[in-house]
Regions:
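Acidic/histidine-rich, surface-exposed loop or edge segments in extracytoplasmic proteins
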Residues: 63-73, 85-88, 132-141
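Catalytic glycan-binding domains that act on GlcNAc-containing polysaccharides
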Residues: 97-287
Length: 287
């Protein structure tokens, strides 16, 4: 997302003449590499600030006016939430999730209906480009980016060598997606993806995310108490969706787990692997 903002900023001399991603982090003004399509979809990370309590659903229909987003449809689906989850067991079993693990992960699970109010309210869709860019580029965030690059210099060296992806782009994604781990979200990924798999207008898409989240826990890559993130189920400092985690996450520190939440090495390398597999070309330049 930050890469898109930086590229768009190049076209506006009033706001960002000669804008370049490396200048944010004190590096030479040339960014190499292109990625197609851009990523969709965040050692130790700074402690996250306290988050406000999760609000209740407003009871209003979704802004999209989709038939599955009417207030009546949302209530009906919420009433059938447990039945919907039970119907997903055969799909989970095919992915290697045990019955015990499945039951444990859905035990007592209730839908987070507040998500229905958030589905069409993401800031990139509700703010102007420049207001949104102002949120992404600040002196504090730039300083934090430089600190991250210095703190993990050896890891960035190794990842650049292994994947050919520019460290400054990885650091920028880390900064945009979670402000360097300080804003990773505190919602249960299991609860969020289960809610969206059974309620609302994107059930087919989020069914895959929910099942993939169950697989992540079954493999032991991420601790259950660490699998927290955004209302949409993105988690970790560079905000992997569960299906993206399955495709791109790597165990770069060699501990047998692909932990993009707690391991800086896994986080940096997995983000680089995502870009590489999505078409990053080291020899190309832009900006």
């Amino acid at each position: 997302m930050f890469l898109l903002c930086a590229a768009a900023a190049l076209g506006s001399p009033a706001h960002a003449q000669g804008f370049d991603i490396r200048t944010l982090f004190g590096a030479s003004p040339t960014v190499t590499g292109t990625v197609s399509p851009p990523p969709t979809t965040p050692g130790t990370t700074p402690a996250a600030p306290a988050s406000p309590a999760i609000q209740e659903w407003s009871g209003e229909p979704g802004a999209s006016n989709h038939p599955l987003m009417t207030a009546e449809a949302i209530r009906d689906a919420a009433n059938n939430f447990r039945g919907c989850l039970a119907a997903l067991w055969p799909l989970a079993e095919r992915r290697g999730v045990t019955r015990a693990a499945f039951d444990a992960n859905i035990a007592g699970l209730t839908p987070d209906l507040r998500i229905m109010d958030l589905l069409d309210a993401q800031p990139e869709f509700t703010k102007s480009f420049w207001d949104y860019l102002d949120l992404l580029v600040s002196e504090d965030r730039i300083a934090n980016g430089r600190s991250v690059l210095a703190q993990h210099r050896a890891t960035f060296d190794a990842v650049e060598k292994a994947y050919g992806v520019d460290r400054h782009v990885i650091a920028a994604i880390w900064g945009v997606e979670s402000n360097y781990g300080t804003q990773i979200g505190d919602r249960s990924v299991i609860r969020s993806t289960a809610t969206l798999a059974c309620i609302g207008r994107r059930q087919d898409y989020f069914r895959e995310e929910f099942l993939s989240a169950l697989e992540i826990l079954s493999r032991g890559d991420v601790r259950p108490d660490h699998l927290k993130g955004s209302w949409a189920g993105a988690f970790g400092p560079t905000q992997f969706m569960p299906t993206s985690f399955k495709r791109y996450a790597v165990d770069f520190d060699g501990d047998g787990r692909r932990d993009v939440v707690s391991s800086a090495a896994d986080l940096i390398a997995s983000t680089a692997n995502n870009l590489k597999k999505d078409g990053w070309i080291p020899s190309e330049t832009w900006g």
